[in-house]
């Protein structure tokens, strides 16, 4: 009822709603990006051990974890160089997406797209700004982490492509999908028998599309249909991090299943702001399980490093993305004319600010913004960061058998 009351000032006459509803077919900027990024862009191969290896969205993460610094740099450059070749196309598509979102927001009598997105999640601007401010206040800690990482990797200079490299060779092993299933089940036993049975169902009934295939969307997602069980899409490549991805996406799927089977239909939907908590709690429980099962000091160090890398990827980077998104959306709301160079410069400035003067950027790093699919879901990425921080606290309470 409260939400309905809040929506009253933003409700349009039926005739206007009808006109807006018909625009979706002509404003599908997301699918244009997906077609270009996932199907049409072909990246230069990466030279590894004297052999040319295919670079795709699915293999990119493995290259970023390579122990060979030259391989990491080549993969990072080749990926972003190709996106740079389509900089104008991608800029126009993204800006048109933002212009459309801002137009719809103003039509619904919101000040801009930022306000509409946050109100839809029942989140205040203070939460968003506090996240950015908190990360800014800990830049010095991140710079110290970067320096420690450089020393462990024995690099003369830390580069933007080196943060996913593993300092401990024991961590670089590969796992099968069946092994990942078993690890996830063991790690999530603390969630109870019902949860375990549901995991077994998901595996046995093949809720999960596991492996990468040609023209398949990159990344990992969970989909709720409302009429059947949820579906999960992975691009499993056999890294230990893929087990974390499996746990994460199953967190979304279980959340959807429980909501749809226990709540009346009007209450089944949940805001994304809390969705990322359910998924990331699973990741944290998996990490705690792996720490508990580690037998040697170096194993524990490797797992701790993995947690720090997850924090880097989920809190640090996603907050940087969130700040970029806010900057560009504000310029759109202010009707500023923007060119590719403006977006590239804004992103490069944030890279320099977040990574500091001692981390080396290459000439194609500034194009990274244009390959982030979540930017086509306005003001989504900050929820990864808030979800991660919340999940750390919640997972600790679960392990300690506390309530709250």
Task: Give each language-model segment a name.
Residues 152-190, 196-197, 255, 308-314, ...:
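Long, K/E/R/D-enriched contiguous segments that form extended
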Residues 1-170:
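A well-structured
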Residues 2-10, 28, 122, 151, ...:
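C-terminal, non-catalytic "cap/extension" segments appended to globular domains
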Residues 172-177, 183, 190, 225-247:
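Short pre-active-site segment immediately N-terminal to the catalytic Zn-binding motif
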Residues 173-175, 208-228:
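Catalytic zinc-binding patch centered on the HExxH motif and its immediate surroundings
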Residues 109, 237-259, 276-279, 284, ...:
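Active-site recognition of the HExxH zinc-binding catalytic motif
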Residues 190-197, 223, 252, 256-264, ...:
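Conserved helix-loop functional segments at active or binding sites
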Residues 269-299, 307-309, 313, 387:
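Post-HExxH zinc-binding segment in Zn-dependent metallohydrolases
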């Amino acid at each position: 009822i409260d939400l309905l009351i809040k929506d009253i000032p933003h409700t349009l006459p039926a005739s206007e709603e009808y006109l807006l509803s018909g625009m979706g077919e002509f404003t599908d900027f997301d699918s244009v990006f997906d077609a270009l990024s996932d199907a049409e862009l072909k990246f230069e191969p990466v030279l590894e051990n004297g052999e040319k290896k295919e670079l795709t969205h699915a293999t990119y993460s493995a290259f970023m974890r390579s122990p060979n610094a030259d391989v990491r740099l080549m993969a990072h450059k080749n990926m972003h160089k190709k996106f740079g070749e389509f900089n104008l196309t991608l800029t126009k598509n993204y800006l048109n997406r933002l212009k459309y979102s801002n137009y719809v927001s103003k039509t619904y009598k919101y000040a801009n797209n930022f306000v509409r997105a946050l109100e839809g999640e029942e989140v205040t601007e203070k939460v968003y700004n506090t996240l950015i401010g908190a990360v800014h206040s800990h830049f010095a800690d991140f710079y110290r982490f970067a320096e420690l990482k450089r020393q462990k990797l024995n690099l003369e200079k830390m580069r933007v492509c080196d943060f996913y490299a593993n300092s401990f060779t024991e961590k670089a092993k590969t796992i099968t999908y069946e092994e990942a299933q078993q690890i996830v089940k063991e790690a999530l036993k603390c969630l109870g028998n019902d949860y375990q049975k549901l995991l077994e169902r998901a595996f046995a009934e093949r809720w999960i599309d596991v492996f990468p295939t040609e023209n398949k969307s990159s990344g990992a997602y969970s989909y709720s249909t409302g009429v059947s069980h949820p579906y999960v899409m992975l691009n499993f490549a056999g890294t230990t991090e893929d087990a974390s991805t499996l746990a994460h996406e199953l967190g979304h799927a279980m959340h959807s299943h429980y909501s749809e089977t226990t709540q009346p239909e009007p209450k089944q939907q949940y805001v994304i702001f809390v969705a990322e908590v359910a998924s990331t709690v699973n990741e944290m429980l998996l990490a705690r399980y792996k720490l508990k099962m580690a037998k040697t000091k170096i194993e524990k160090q490797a797992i701790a490093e993995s947690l720090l890398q997850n924090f880097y990827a989920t809190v640090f980077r996603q907050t940087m993305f969130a700040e970029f998104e806010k900057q560009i959306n504000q310029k759109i709301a202010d009707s500023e004319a923007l060119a590719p160079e403006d977006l590239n410069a804004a992103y490069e400035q944030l890279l320099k600010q977040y990574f500091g003067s001692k981390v080396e950027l290459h000439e194609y790093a500034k194009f990274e913004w244009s390959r982030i699919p979540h930017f086509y879901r306005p003001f989504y990425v900050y929820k990864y960061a808030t979800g991660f921080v919340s999940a750390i606290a919640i997972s600790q309470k679960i392990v300690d058998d506390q309530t709250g």
